[in-house]
Amino acid sequence: KVKVVMLECRESFEHCFCVSMGTNKTDKYDAAVRITEHEVLAEVRDEKLGAAFSFVSASSCDFTPEFVQENQKKLHIPKITDRSMLKPISDLEYWNQFDEKCMSCGGCNTVCGTCSCFDTVDVIYQEGSRSGERRRVWSSCMLETFTQTAGGGRARKTPGANMRFKVLHKFYDFADRFVKDGSHGIACDAQMCIGCGRCDMRCPKKISFFDAVDGLAAEIEKMNTGEEA
């Protein structure tokens, strides 16, 4: 029942690394649209979707959507081939730099197309009553209060630990849990990051998620070659 309409993107901007993630192009859409200053071009593949636009005055044209072919940035994706690597990766001093840089605002999560962390809260309808509900609400893994329990304890206590969690979730955990063999056809071995670069644009402290991931790839390379990380 869901129809997918793709808005064409032909030009990369400075923070984007979609080509590295394999998300720069697709053939999985029901309609594609190009919007210019003077006209709208559309390729409609789905008959039912085409019928929905029958009231529009349009003329036939030869339109095939184009895609970004190259970015200004090229990401080195961290190669985590075994779970035994997770402990030494977690212990890297590399993550400590984010303790000073990150202000834990969660802005990067709010603009991310794939962030889906949530919290569970109890909502009481009226003070003193016993009626209410338990709700699952959207949250941010970069917030100081994320994972905080009723007793005040926290699983991750620093911005650096939160950054480590986010990076590993995007570039290891998701694929390890859901698409181990890549059979689902998700780009780049099912990495959760799509390389849109919106988080880099949003961060008020100018922290680059691209640099964080690229830097981790370099640290892992050092580990694998026996160099000092």
In which residue ranges do the predicted regions lie?
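Iron-sulfur-associated redox domains of electron-transfer enzymes in respiratory
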Residues: 1-87, 95, 115-118, 126
